Amino acid sequence: MTSLTVIDDLKQTLRFTQNALKRKAAYNPSEQFNEIQIETVSVCNRSCDFCPNSVLAPPAARMSPILLQKIATELADMDYAGKIGLYLRNEPFMDKSLNDHVRLFKKFCPKSFIYIASDGDLVTVEKLQKIFEAGIS
């Protein structure tokens, strides 16, 4: 009886492995993730208690346009249609090129939902109009 159990276990393992290989063969990179957040600048105008920046703020930095273009191109190559958040632990309106970034991702990933999250301190009606014209979702 023990040898039958071992054989049954081996058959089950083989079926499991075959199914896993079939899933891997049908793998679509665009299904790997459905949301990405990109921090284009590392600065924020606040120091919220719940944010890691309140304890250890990163040095002020800006993502290079070359890297941003590379990310947009790679997402386009995947036919990415998920969410793109142009913020992480920063205030997106502190990025003077924010509207350009929105246009870039709208061009390369037209099916994506492009969004930001802001504390609102720097928002004006004019800035809102411009970011919507740029293509923010």
PLM regions and their residue ranges:
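Conserved alpha-helical substructure of the radical SAM core
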Residues: 2-137
